[in-house]
């Protein structure tokens, strides 16, 4: 099921990107998304990844990748050097997510961010009825070994963009194998029933 969710997320991200664009994938993991974008959309893609094993997998696939920490390495990229910057389910793991977002918006003409939605109804129910930090398919780690430092909801990210005058171009909610557009008028209900939020901002 996790692979299905990941494939759906990557398909949504790929659909947001035009053919032949230049993309930086921050926290690119093993390069699965980069590989998809390169093969399906002829995208010139580069990755930034901290984990050495993931970097080796990217290299093995013939994908251009730099090993480094996004919180300390993004300043090296010139302004507007990519058409898009992608950050997939990583924002919540940074110590200073606002600073990272500022760098992404500086580096890319547009930015695509996906987040696990802490406002999903099953997450809320776990906290409400059991009084425990939730463990779900999109939040698979227990509280004591999770990489997540700053959990947020789809609504939180909407509000953040409003406060910082960041233009929201499109938001897609993902739930299992279904997707739906999220607007301000349906934000409350989509925040409740979407496991994942994918934002196109810039």
Q: What spans do the regions from the language model cover?
A:
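Class I SAM-dependent methyltransferase "Motif I" SAM/SAH-binding loop
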Residues: 27-29
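A short SAM/SAH-binding and catalytic strip from SAM-dependent methyltransferases
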Residues: 84-96
């Amino acid at each position: 099921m996790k692979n299905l969710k990941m494939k759906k997320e990557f398909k949504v991200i790929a659909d947001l990107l035009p053919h032949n664009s230049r993309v930086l994938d921050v926290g690119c993991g093993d390069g699965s998304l980069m590989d998809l974008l390169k093969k399906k959309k002829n995208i010139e893609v580069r990755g930034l990844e901290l984990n050495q094993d993931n970097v080796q997998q990217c290299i093995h696939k013939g994908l251009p990748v730099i090993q480094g920490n996004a919180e300390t390495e993004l300043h090296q990229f010139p302004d507007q050097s990519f058409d898009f910057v992608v950050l997939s389910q990583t924002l919540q793991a940074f110590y200073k997510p606002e600073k990272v977002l500022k760098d992404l918006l500086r580096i890319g003409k547009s930015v695509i961010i996906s987040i696990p939605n802490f406002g999903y109804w099953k997450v809320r129910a776990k906290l409400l009825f059991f009084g425990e930090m939730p463990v779900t398919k999109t939040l698979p780690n227990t509280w004591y070994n999770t990489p997540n430092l700053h959990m947020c909801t789809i609504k939180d990210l909407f509000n953040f963009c409003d406060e910082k005058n960041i233009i929201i171009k499109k938001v897609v909610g993902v739930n299992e194998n279904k997707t739906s557009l999220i607007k301000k008028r349906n934000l409350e209900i989509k925040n409740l029933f979407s496991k994942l939020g994918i934002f196109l901002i810039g």
